[in-house]
Amino acid sequence: MGQVASMPHRCGTYVLELHEWYRKFVEECPSGLITLHEFRQFFSDVTVGENSSEYAEQIFRALDNNGDGIVDFREYVTAISMLAHGTPEDKLKWSFKLYDKDGDGAITRSEMLEIMRAVYKMSVVASLTKVNPMTAEECTNRIFVRLDKDQNAIISLQEFVDGSLGDEWVRQMLECDLSTVEIQKMTKHSHLPARSSRERLFHANT
């Protein structure tokens, strides 16, 4: 997803600010370690509940650099620092890990669609209304058309970075950028979430 983060925003989603995650991390994990189960729990507390579980798992995997199933402060702070102060290329390289689920260095259509569906599910729950939204499939297809330059049905890291830097719509959908994140939050006097101005990302933008 520009995820903390844009992460992938997207197909219309928001993700929390990593600084808020860090605060909760310190409060809820004073040991300095967090498991996937714990991460899913506090991720759901500040987004849209259980509908965020699939996306939370992908974010956790991207944070867990050494693949030991635990995220420590070092891994977490490294991601925060990079997403807050890194170059556009750095942010896109981190975003790439979210979509490259099997870590083989390439994103397949099914891998991207899986993330887009998870993000889309979160957005549907958080949004009040949407007019003619793009589907997760349409979003994935559009991104593949624009990024898969050699048409070999996969997106390499180079294609992901170069294509996103050269296409503002794709970059908005995929880049993790702390400065552009907006969070759906419950209003003080209502059980309904406030509508985010970034819902426009659900719509076709050519």
UniProtKB/Swiss-Prot annotation:
GO terms for molecular function: calcium ion binding. Residues 31-49, 51-86, 87-122, 135-170 form the EF-hand domain. InterPro entries: EF-hand-dom_pair (IPR011992), EF_Hand_1_Ca_BS (IPR018247), EF_hand_dom (IPR002048), Recoverin (IPR028846). A lipid is attached at G2 (N-myristoyl glycine). Coiled coil: none annotated. Ca(2+) 1 binds at D64, N66, D68, E75. Signal peptide: none annotated. Retina; inner segments, somata and synaptic terminals of cone receptors. Keywords: Calcium, Lipoprotein, Metal-binding, Myristate, Repeat, Sensory transduction, Vision. Ca(2+) 2 binds at D100, D102, D104, E111. Does not stimulate guanylyl cyclase (GC) when free calcium ion concentration is low, but inhibits GC when free calcium ions concentration is elevated. Binds two calcium ions. This is Guanylyl cyclase inhibitory protein.
